UniProtKB/Swiss-Prot annotation:
Component of the large ribosomal subunit. The gene is rpl15. It comes from Paramisgurnus dabryanus. Its main location: cytoplasm. Component of the large ribosomal subunit. The ribosome is a large ribonucleoprotein complex responsible for the synthesis of proteins in the cell. GO terms for molecular function: RNA binding; structural constituent of ribosome. It holds the Pfam family Ribosomal_L15e. SMART domains: Ribosomal_L15e (SM01384). This is Large ribosomal subunit protein eL15. Belongs to the eukaryotic ribosomal protein eL15 family. GO terms for biological process: cytoplasmic translation.
Length: 204
């Protein structure tokens, strides 16, 4: 096994004495920093490389701190205006994961970069911490490489806002296998519409 494989196994055993100590110390360190800051290199190089990161020019890592818990509806004095069934303010659950929220914040902050992917690096009782891989699409090392040219195209602008990253697709319920039958046809709505539309084909 290579070094990255050993590193992967270390991260799989998060309850081990070494990892529990490391994660506690790192969470303390991350809490002292701002909620969004650039890191010189990835905390988990094995995971970052599996997601497409390369230690060369054009790749940037940002660490994002996201507050845990549900999403309170932003309404003034709890006035939601409407039927009582829609009066909920506090117990509202956000449709997307905190990881996709972290990607969105990184994408907003670095408008000229493209979000490639992200991964978990730690959490405590209040926050979750993610590292987001961003790509500088105007760098020659990215534009001239056939493996990374795809992300330079205009169709991938703010892909994190449209649920096109790995975390975003997971929140949309997309994937392969029997677990994802609810989204056959592109989305939950498309699958529901197809299954609930009565089609009476003309007999010929």
């Amino acid at each position: 096994m290579g070094a990255y494989k050993y590193m992967q196994e270390l991260w799989r055993k998060k309850q081990s004495d070494v990892m529990r100590f490391l994660l506690r110390v790192r969470c303390w360190q991350y809490r002292q920093l701002s909620s969004l800051h650039r890191t010189p290199k990835p905390t988990r190089p094995d995971k970052a490389r599996r997601l497409g990161y390369k230690a060369k020019q054009g790749y940037v890592i940002y660490r994002i701190r996201v507050r845990r818990g549900g999403r309170k509806r932003p309404v003034p004095k709890g006035a939601t205006y409407g039927k009582p069934v829609h009066h909920g303010v506090n117990q509202i659950k956000f449709a997307r994961s905190l990881q996709s929220t972290a990607e969105e914040r990184a994408g907003r902050h670095c408008g000229g970069l493209r979000v490639l992917s992200s991964y978990w690096v730690g959490e405590d009782s209040t926050y979750k911490f993610f590292e987001v891989i961003l790509v500088d699409i105007f760098h020659k090392a990215i534009r001239r490489n056939p493996d990374t040219q795809w992300i330079t195209k205009a169709v991938h602008k703010h892909r994190e806002m449209r649920g096109l990253t790995s975390a975003g697709k997971k929140s949309r319920g997309l994937g392969k296998g029997h677990k994802f039958h609810l989204t056959i046809g592109g989305s939950r709505r498309a699958a529901w519409r197809r299954r609930n539309t009565l089609q009476l084909h003309r007999y010929r």
